[in-house]
A protein has these predicted regions:
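Flexible, small-/acidic-enriched active-site or ligand-binding loops
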Residues: 1-18
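Alpha-helical interface subdomain recognition
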Residues: 22-178
């Protein structure tokens, strides 16, 4: 089912010169919907925890649930920060390091975010009729696209170890955050 229809008839497109790695670019770009879906799943999970009652009180009042949601919020914030950083790097034109770091961080966050969201919801989170699964299934799909955690960790390692030992610190702290 389509949500919208776009037409680009008679639209002029300017071709820009680009010599980058398509896998790196794709890995960078996919972090935005990953981060957005994690935000949505977090909002749904917090809302559910604040509505669902068990043992006479809202499950969001239980310390264990609060702790898990705090970890989820941290992971979602990390994914958002990583995605923002890689898009700033894309604007600068030097994004290999940020792409590897961002996709790796978003993949790591995806594991925790989906685990926690489904634990908070219990079985209802997996049902086709409940909205949570539409976000978590997308997160898992995007996580597996354009390279695994091991792939991006290797990329990040290759980039950092290719720096001259004397210039490594400058390379790390001199990254412009846009």
């Amino acid at each position: 089912r389509s949500a919208a229809s776009l037409s680009f008839d008679n639209t002029e497109v300017e071709l820009l010169p680009w010599t980058g790695n398509l896998m790196t670019l794709a890995g960078a770009v996919i972090t935005a919907p990953m981060a957005g879906a994690m935000d949505a799943a977090l909002e749904i999970s917090v809302g559910y925890a604040n509505d669902r009652e068990q043992f006479g009180k809202k499950i969001g009042k239980f310390q264990a649930v609060q702790q898990e949601l705090a970890v989820f919020a941290l992971e979602a914030a990390a994914a958002n920060s990583a995605s923002i950083a890689v898009f700033a790097a894309l604007e600068r034109g030097e994004y290999d390091f940020e792409a590897a770091a961002s996709k790796l961080r978003c993949n790591m966050a995806a594991s925790e975010a989906t685990r926690i969201s489904h634990q908070v919801h219990g079985a209802i989170g997996f049902t086709q009729d409940y909205i949570l699964q539409s976000f978590t299934r997308q997160i898992w799909g995007w996580r597996s696209r354009f390279g695994s955690e091991a792939f991006w960790a290797d990329q990040l390692g290759d980039i950092t170890t290719s720096q001259n030992g004397n210039d490594f610190w400058s390379f790390m702290v001199g990254r412009d955050q846009g």
